[in-house]
Amino acid sequence: MAEECLVSRKKFGGKAMEVRSEMWTGLDLCSQGIKNISKSLFDMRFIRTLNLANNEIEVIPREICNLRHLEVLNLSKNKIRSIPPEIGKIVSLRELNLSDNLISNIPMEMGTLYNLEVFEIANNPLIVPFNTLIRDKKLLQFCREHNTGYPPPNDRLWIECTGKNVFYGDTVSVGTFNILSNIYATRMTYAPSWVINSEFRREGVLQEIVLYNVDILCLQEIELYSFFDFYKEQLEMRCNYDSIIYPRGRVKSVPDKKNVDGCAIFWRRSKFRLIAQFPIDFHQKVIQDTRFNTNQELLDRYGKKDNIAIGALLERPNGQQVLVMNTHIFWDPDYPDIKLLQVLLLVEEIKRVSSRHPNACLLLQGDFNSLRSSSVYKSITTPVIDFADFGDTMQHLSNQQFGDGLGLNDAYSNQDLGFTNFTPGFKGVIDYIFYGGGISLASVLSPVEDEYTENVAGLPNMHFPSDHIFLGAKFAFPNKNISQNAFGRNSRQ
């Protein structure tokens, strides 16, 4: 249903109008003698252009940040004395005109307007250093570099989960973290340059890992050089970790292999030893599988997407085995069919390995780039494969013998997680910790509170080294004499 918004008759001085978003995308209220902006205006979240020039406006309401699709804003020739910090949340802005007002100060939050191409603020009594910075066209850069006035988030705590089985033994803690490849970080121009600096972020990532100090850790977007030159040694020394890494498929073709990122698994050597590892290159599986490699339309759509997964079969001192799978699924929301295909190939590999190790518990972690409403999520958390996201291009594949879904549990299914990935253009849950094989969820790491995200445009920032957050869970492992199966419930539960 189209949004309906009412322009206040009292505030704007004209006849009240009912307007619908499909009718227009801009609003011109220039030279209307307006003194106050009606709050109802900020319910028109569909508008892209707003002209309020040449009026008598003294205050810009902080609710202006609700206009998240606004691209052009003209407030020139008014009596405005200050800019609300909330304007920095309108990251879609491309043109902003605040000329001919009474503005003396600039909020540092303006630095997050990374799409801003035209910024006019002439004929304002700007104080030092803003008057000089605007002349040298360095004002927004200055704001971006000094945008540090927001408070830190609350400490994240372990939240206990009810129903721990009395027959269970000790607990094992696990975590997953997409640490943001340095190549991708440099594209996040809404963040200060010192925030996306590779050494600054590297230390921040290390601090988070050491802080939570889990027994099994899965990392995504970790470059080969970062792994071998830094994380492997540092985490061996600080957390007593052993580790393996598997890079993206492009490592076979690019000359600068050290910058290729991949997935890595770390485990505490005092609690586990490596029995076997299982690298998975989804692209290679597609081009080698007779179900797919004769379908040119499918091959063209898949292209050279080089997403991967890595598995590790770990064994505890008591002989109990754990199959840990870490994956990074394709990112583009326009390709839900490719995401589902990659996950179905992953599901097949998990079943193949699990059939050889039927008593192993299962942990599946990573960045799945998929919401809980997706076929990807449903195919992992239910016993039935959901083919809805295959669409027309790959619908014929739903008839192939993919078998059943995994029917795993989501460690955060009972938590209001809010987000695991937060950028100016997206905020949602796409990272997961799935588990099965008789282990029982004991606790999870608490979410980042929504109140914190209301003050920032996106991650990374000075408090978070990546655009993803660290997820953690603790599991109570069954005593070894209790029968279990990776895809079924414990016999005593």
From Swiss-Prot:
Disulfide links within the chain: none
Localisation per UniProt entry: Cytoplasm; Nucleus
Cellular component, GO annotation: cytoplasm; nucleus
Residues that bind Mg(2+): E221
Cofactors: Mg(2+)
Record's keyword annotation contains Nucleus: yes
Keywords annotated in UniProt: Activator, Cytoplasm, Exonuclease, Hydrolase, Leucine-rich repeat, Magnesium, Metal-binding, Nuclease, Nucleus, Repeat, Repressor, RNA-binding, Transcription, Transcription regulation
Enzyme class, UniProt record, top EC level: hydrolase
InterPro entries (alphabetical): CCR4/nocturin_mRNA_transcr, Endo/exonu/phosph_ase_sf, Endo/exonuclease/phosphatase, Leu-rich_rpt, Leu-rich_rpt_typical-subtyp, LRR_dom_sf, LRR_R13L4/SHOC2-like
SMART domains in the cross-refs: LRR_TYP
Highest taxon above the source species: Eukaryota
LRR repeats: 23-44, 46-67, 69-90, 92-113, 115-134
Example GO molecular function: metal ion binding
TM spans (from-to): none
Keyword set includes Magnesium: yes
Entry's EC annotation: 3.1.13.4
Catalysed conversion reaction: Exonucleolytic cleavage of poly(A) to 5'-AMP
Subunit and interaction comment: Component of the CCR4-NOT core complex.
Family: Belongs to the CCR4/nocturin family.
Biological role: Acts as a catalytic component of the CCR4-NOT core complex, which in the nucleus seems to be a general transcription factor, and in the cytoplasm the major mRNA deadenylase involved in mRNA turnover. Ccr4 has 3'-5' RNase activity with a strong preference for polyadenylated substrates and also low exonuclease activity towards single-stranded DNA.
Name recorded for this polypeptide: Probable CCR4-Not complex 3'-5'-exoribonuclease subunit Ccr4
